[in-house]
Amino acid sequence: MYAIIETGGKQFRVEEGSKIFVEKLASEAGSEIVIDKVLMLGGGDVKVGAPYVENAKVTAEVVEHGRGEKVVIFKKWRRNDSRKKQGHRQDFTALKIKAITA
């Protein structure tokens, strides 16, 4: 069985035992969270929500918090001897999916 969930403004396809990286959540590492924004349940019997599937939830464990790879933003204006370099690292939370209940 799999589910499509929504968290942090993004959608993820998850199965039991899978590990996903989502936008940073305000939960301690090792704690358990429940995601009730389930857009679709798949497997044998497919259920599509409008917008969410009723009484469906996904239980996940917070594995760790971290920061992603550095993205370099470089802007250069020709003939002006002007340039700007900036870096960004996005915070993330790693989740391990424990259970999908409908």
From Swiss-Prot:
Domain of life the protein comes from: Bacteria
InterPro entries: bL21-like, bL21-like_sf, Ribosomal_bL21
Pfam family, one: Ribosomal_L21p
UniProt entry keywords in alphabetical sequence: Ribonucleoprotein, Ribosomal protein, RNA-binding, rRNA-binding
GO cellular component: cytoplasm; ribonucleoprotein complex; ribosome
An annotated GO BP: translation
A molecular-function term among this protein's GO annotations: rRNA binding
Function: This protein binds to 23S rRNA in the presence of protein L20.
Subunit organization: Part of the 50S ribosomal subunit. Contacts protein L20.
Protein family per UniProt: Belongs to the bacterial ribosomal protein bL21 family.
HAMAP family: Ribosomal_bL21 (MF_01363)
Protein name: Large ribosomal subunit protein bL21
Organism of this sequence: Nitratidesulfovibrio vulgaris (strain ATCC 29579 / DSM 644 / CCUG 34227 / NCIMB 8303 / VKM B-1760 / Hildenborough) (Desulfovibrio vulgaris)
